[in-house]
Amino acid sequence: MDDEIKDMEGQTPEEEIQGQDSHSDYKPADRFDASAVHHLSGMYKNWFLDYASYVILERAVPHIEDGLKPVQRRILHSMKRMDDGRYNKVANIVGHTMQFHPHGDASIGDALVQLGQKDLLIDTQGNWGNILTGDRAAAPRYIEARLSKFALETVFNPKTTEWQLSYDGRNKEPITLPVKFPLLLAQGAEGIAVGLSSKILPHNLNDICDAAIKYLRGEEFNIYPDFPTGGSIDDSKYNDGQ
């Protein structure tokens, strides 16, 4: 025992750690090795940019091509895979979507309820809450959903969809959905990312159709938000994002 203590007295902390029994092969970096030194300022800058871009692209901001956030796109993709014309329990849809979305069942359930309350892409059954009174939806095991006929007609087309591997590489998921309709304007979008946020107000379905026809004819058109719960807006600076 005394011999072991004497041997350890001349060791550096790194050598002491390496000499201890461990189940890990990890070896601490040598503080005298210049190549192993990481400056805090550089680490913060690089890692923060990685984190910010991930939140922007993978969590909070909708894609302009289909108007959907990743969780919304994965929900619709899962519902299309499950679709047999009948209603599915929301809890079942949430569980299926977790194959593609690695951020927990709560975020999937909340996003699904928000999509259902817009009454555009999802045909709902049960107590889905009320946007006029602020009442919450019932628990996922009590409410049901299926894709609406509008969604089946305008959102999906496997032949024109670009695919990528899911987060664990076990499944394929769409990069964006080939939506035939300006869904971003119809649903609106709101998300807070890192360094930026998005807030696009919803628009009236009939106004969007009229504007699309005029656009295809090369005619001028004006289109302004329309609030499902009512309200008024000063649109004098709307085109400037204010």
What are these regions (language model features)?
Residues 1-241:
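Catalytic phosphate-handling regions of large nucleic-acid enzymes and associated NTPases
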